[in-house]
Amino acid sequence: MEIKLEHVSKKYGRHTAVNDVSITLSSGRIYGLIGPNGSGKSTTLKMMAGLLFPTSGFVKVDEEQVTREMVRQTAYLTELDMFYPHFTVKDMVNFYQSQFPDFHTEQVYKLLNEMQLNPEKKIKKLSKGNRGRLKIVLALARRADVILLDEPFSGLDPMVRDSIVNSLVSYIDFEQQIVVIATHEIDEIETLLDEVIILANGEKVAQREVEDIREQEGMSVLQWFKSKMEVC
């Protein structure tokens, strides 16, 4: 599978959230979409998922223009809590199973066990860290072609972040899936990434292979990001 954003722009009224961005994503690769708050990361992810359509430009999947059907092929983790608070964890699992044919029930219970989440516990009684874990569990339990994670580490303590990174390593299909992680927690994901894309002020600043950054620039991804932001 290949996803292409071709000269994509998105406006909300007079505000331009994304401006003339072109990106190509291929199966079997993990991408870091990084940038400061308000750089257009979330809007870009939503256009990749078919949840938003561009004001101009095209989003294509295998050369076909993206439609709402793309949502069915995409596991999208929003930075917002989208849970029904009166549900238990098990209720939420059953809801996802009813909505997504690619939802893997056996895998979800393995993940719940690894994340130390009690299926019988009410969502409203989960800590912020455990709600973050549950969002990751529900995303990774799908056998989706595309996994889009919007700020998966936001507000979580280092121990929770480590458990999430370990789950990503264990449950992502590194041969078949496209994975995009939008974050400003760059150090947490550097070891996972194949490529990094920098957005700033709604525009693509750079896209580079992580290996090239290390070998040719002699920098970590965070150092490279900071050097690019200095000239923006």
Swiss-Prot record:
PROSITE patterns: ABC_TRANSPORTER_2. Keywords: ATP-binding, Nucleotide-binding, Transport. CDD domains: ABC_DR_subfamily_A. GO terms for molecular function: ATP binding; ATP hydrolysis activity. It holds the Pfam family ABC_tran. InterPro entries: AAA+_ATPase, ABC_transporter-like_ATP-bd, P-loop_NTPase. Gene3D superfamilies: P-loop containing nucleotide triphosphate hydrolases (3.40.50.300). The keyword Transport applies. Residues 3-226 form the ABC transporter domain. ATP binds at residues 35-42. Belongs to the ABC transporter superfamily. This is Uncharacterized ABC transporter ATP-binding protein YhcG. It comes from Bacillus subtilis (strain 168). The gene is yhcG.
